[in-house]
């Protein structure tokens, strides 16, 4: 049993990129689906597909690599808030990731949002992870 599904999600992507895989399968949940949509909109992954099965479903993510250097598009996936130590931020406390080059994913009262979306809507929430 996985005690931290978000950390598992990030670790599966990180390990697949380190191994040079093109596609990674991740057990689905609504939170992971929304995080995947954010990764796609921010340009960190090529495409994704949700597949239903008898259990919870699977998210298939096509990873993105630089065509010239073969380096992954995602340089770092960093879990911030964790089950043992939750990290919350007010709208004014949401900091930029890598001076605006990265993205923070937050779980807010208005759903799962990026740091820029949360600031624009003036909502704070739990800082799930930093991606750059």
Regions found by a protein language model. Give the residues of each.
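Core subunits and conserved enzymes of cellular information-processing
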Residues: 1-132
């Amino acid at each position: 049993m996985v005690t931290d599904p978000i950390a598992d999600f990030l670790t599966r992507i990180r390990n697949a990129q380190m191994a040079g895989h093109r596609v990674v399968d991740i057990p689905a949940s609504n939170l992971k689906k929304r995080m995947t949509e954010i990764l796609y909109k921010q340009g960190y992954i090529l495409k994704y597909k949700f597949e239903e099965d008898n259990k919870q479903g699977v998210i298939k993510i096509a990873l993105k690599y630089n065509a010239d250097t073969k380096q992954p598009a995602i340089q770092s996936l960093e879990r911030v808030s964790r089950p043992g130590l939750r990290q919350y931020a007010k709208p004014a406390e949401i900091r930029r990731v890598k001076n605006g080059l990265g993205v923070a994913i937050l779980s807010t009262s208005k759903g799962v949002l990026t740091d820029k979306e949360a600031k624009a809507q003036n909502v704070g929430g739990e800082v799930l992870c930093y991606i750059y």
